[in-house]
């Protein structure tokens, strides 16, 4: 299985002047924990890191002793563009691909393997967790306009897995139609293509804010004990 780590983010919501994936977490950069899980996943045989040129040297240091083939891919100005570039850089033999956010540093190898297995079996798939809070729709004036049925709501995570050629086709259509999507599952939705949900742990958070860093440190400490 081929896997792309999207690592082209910034640290703006962290209040940092550098990529949030290079901020320290339990004594190591955030991205190092993500890489560990990918390297531990038996299903993964090839890894592409999609990042910005300014971060390349530091990220490649983290990969100096990587146990699997890793390729550096220069990212774009948006996540969507970065994934497109990652897809173009895949080896010609790649039939399936997992897309994983570098900021989801608490993902475990078992989850990555489950996603890979589902994709090979023929499904487009995303890791997700059922929503436990009551969600409200709110208008531009801050007034509640509705309450979706919580039983139908899941919080999307990564990895997200797809057949390579179909995902490339989807991105080509999005580009032709001027669509902007925040993840690849949203692209499939717009095209009417089915995507299966695989239940993941609520611990598989995306580290975006200082509070997230605190939570991630606590989870890492708990796992160590």
From Swiss-Prot:
Q: Name one GO molecular function term.
A: 2-C-methyl-D-erythritol 4-phosphate cytidylyltransferase activity
Listed disulfide bonds for this chain? none
Keyword terms: Isoprene biosynthesis, Nucleotidyltransferase, Transferase
Annotated positions for site Transition state stabilizer: 13, 20
Q: Could you tell me which HAMAP family the record lists for this protein? A: IspD (MF_00108)
Instruction: State the reactions this protein catalyses.
Output: 2-C-methyl-D-erythritol 4-phosphate + CTP + H(+) = 4-CDP-2-C-methyl-D-erythritol + diphosphate
The pathway that the record names for this protein is:
Isoprenoid biosynthesis; isopentenyl diphosphate biosynthesis via DXP pathway; isopentenyl diphosphate from 1-deoxy-D-xylulose 5-phosphate: step 2/6
Q: Which Pfam families match?
A: IspD
Which CDD domains does the annotation name? CDP-ME_synthetase
Coiled-coil portions: none
Family per record: Belongs to the IspD/TarI cytidylyltransferase family. IspD subfamily.
**Which residues carry the site feature described as Positions MEP for the nucleophilic attack?**
150, 206
Name it: 2-C-methyl-D-erythritol 4-phosphate cytidylyltransferase
State its Enzyme Commission number(s): 2.7.7.60
Q: Which InterPro entries match?
A: IspD, IspD/TarI, IspD/TarI_cytidylyltransf_bact, ISPD_synthase_CS, Nucleotide-diphossugar_trans
Q: What does this protein do?
A: Catalyzes the formation of 4-diphosphocytidyl-2-C-methyl-D-erythritol from CTP and 2-C-methyl-D-erythritol 4-phosphate (MEP).
Give me the gene this protein comes from. ispD
GO biological process terms on file: isopentenyl diphosphate biosynthetic process, methylerythritol 4-phosphate pathway
């Amino acid at each position: 299985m081929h896997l792309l780590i999207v690592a082209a983010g910034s640290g703006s919501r962290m209040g940092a002047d550098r990529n949030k994936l290079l901020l320290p977490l339990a004594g190591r950069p955030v991205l190092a924990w993500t890489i560990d899980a990918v390297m531990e996943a038996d299903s993964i045989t090839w890894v592409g890191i999609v990042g910005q040129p300014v971060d390349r040297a530091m990220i490649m240091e983290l990969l100096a002793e990587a146990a699997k083939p890793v390729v550096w891919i220069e990212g774009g100005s948006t996540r969507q563009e970065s994934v497109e570039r990652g897809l173009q850089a895949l080896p010609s033999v790649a039939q399936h691909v997992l897309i994983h956010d570098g900021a989801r540093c608490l993902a475990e190898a078992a989850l990555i393997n489950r996603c890979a297995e589902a994709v090979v079996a023929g499904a487009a798939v995303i890791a997700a967790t059922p929503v436990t809070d009551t969600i409200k729709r709110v208008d531009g004036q801050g007034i509640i306009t509705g309450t979706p049925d919580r039983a139908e709501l899941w919080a999307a995570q990564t990895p997200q897995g797809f057949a390579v050629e179909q995902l490339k086709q989807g991105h080509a259509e999005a580009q032709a139609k001027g669509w902007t999507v925040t993840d690849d599952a949203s692209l499939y939705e717009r095209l009417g293509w089915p995507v299966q949900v695989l239940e993941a742990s609520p611990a598989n958070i995306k580290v975006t804010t200082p509070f997230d860093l605190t939570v991630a440190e606590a989870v890492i400490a708990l796992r160590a004990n």
